Curated annotation (Swiss-Prot):
<comment type="function">
    <text>Part of ribonuclease P, a protein complex that generates mature tRNA molecules by cleaving their 5'-ends.</text>
</comment>
<dbReference type="InterPro" id="IPR002730">
    <property type="entry name" value="Rpp29/RNP1"/>
</dbReference>
<comment type="similarity">
    <text>Belongs to the eukaryotic/archaeal RNase P protein component 1 family.</text>
</comment>
<dbReference type="InterPro" id="IPR023534">
    <property type="entry name" value="Rof/RNase_P-like"/>
</dbReference>
<keyword id="KW-0540">Nuclease</keyword>
<dbReference type="GO" id="GO:0005737">
    <property type="term" value="C:cytoplasm"/>
</dbReference>
<dbReference type="InterPro" id="IPR023538">
    <property type="entry name" value="RNP1"/>
</dbReference>
<dbReference type="Pfam" id="PF01868">
    <property type="entry name" value="RNase_P-MRP_p29"/>
</dbReference>
<keyword id="KW-0255">Endonuclease</keyword>
<dbReference type="InterPro" id="IPR036980">
    <property type="entry name" value="RNase_P/MRP_Rpp29_sf"/>
</dbReference>
<dbReference type="GO" id="GO:0001682">
    <property type="term" value="P:tRNA 5'-leader removal"/>
</dbReference>
<dbReference type="GO" id="GO:0003723">
    <property type="term" value="F:RNA binding"/>
</dbReference>
<comment type="subunit">
    <text>Consists of a catalytic RNA component and at least 4-5 protein subunits.</text>
</comment>
<keyword id="KW-0963">Cytoplasm</keyword>
<keyword id="KW-0378">Hydrolase</keyword>
<dbReference type="GO" id="GO:0004526">
    <property type="term" value="F:ribonuclease P activity"/>
</dbReference>
<keyword id="KW-0819">tRNA processing</keyword>
Length: 111
């Protein structure tokens, strides 16, 4: 399945370009690079100069560039936990709901 703004939290983030928009550590704000590692609680971002920096997911807001070139804002709480845990959360969604991202609304159903 293709990574989109609507399902990005249920995919691996490794390989995506990322920018830290907000975080509890002021020294990491504005950090930009490629996600090279993902754990339950953090992302490791490799910058252009080759530095690898660990950023905690909690209390952070990220901007990810999708493979098609568009950018999506994701709160750290949405990507908290391992990929398997995030997919389990998807399985617990019931019925019809709304996903809201970047000022748009899209209806989803669990089928």
């Amino acid at each position: 399945m293709k990574r989109t703004a609507w399902n990005i939290v249920f995919h691996s983030l490794i390989g995506l370009r990322a920018r830290v928009l907000a975080t509890s550590d002021p020294g990491l704000r504005g950090l930009e690079g490629v996600v090279v590692e993902e754990t339950r609680h953090s992302l490791v971002v490799e910058t252009r100069d080759g530095r690898r920096v660990r950023v905690l997911k909690a209390n952070s807001i990220f901007l990810f560039q999708l493979p098609g070139g568009s950018w999506v804002v994701v709160r750290g709480e949405e990507i908290a936990g391992s990929l398997a845990e995030r997919v389990k959360r998807l399985g617990r969604l019931k019925g019809v709901g709304w996903l809201v991202r970047a000022g748009e609304k899209r209806r989803y159903t669990r089928g």
